[in-house]
Amino acid sequence: MPEWYPLLVGHTSKTLVLESNSDFSQALAGLEWPGYFIKDYVKSLNMGSGSLVDKPQEIAPLVKLMLQYRGQIEGGICVRRREDYLEGTEQRYFVFQGQAYSPNAKIPELVTACAQVIDSPFFSIDLALRADGELRVIELGDGQVSDRKEWGAERFVEMLARRQ
């Protein structure tokens, strides 16, 4: 995340990257964000109450759970300003060799813009509509795809079979 965030800062949630042993209350003092989404450089916590917390003092216990369940923290802790997204609007796209792909052939302009600024041969882009209707980047994946989400296997293989 620290690599792509500066390139897409205007299209994603505000984010601070901190050490895993930080005093989160002190580091986040004065921000007054409506909540926080917590992840390390690679992944969020997908069990229990998840990675959403309301107060900075809830972050350290969440980081401890991440460490317990995953065995390590990858890089630092990404503290993201919680944004409200419209339910059911998150969708995954892929970029392969600079070309953007969609599971349904409709590719938002934001995906194409990401494909132009991210220098990687293969990555995923998760987008969702924020409550105000703005399309936002939720996450970029570095090719270590854990799930195709709404992509059928045939469509995914079709994308990978294309060579430029």
Q: What are the functions of these language-model segments?
A:
Residues 99, 106-164:
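ATP-dependent carboxylate activation and anion-phosphoryl transfer catalytic cores
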Residues 1-113, 162-164:
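Active-site nucleotide/adenylate-binding loops and adjacent lid/helix of ATP-dependent enzymes
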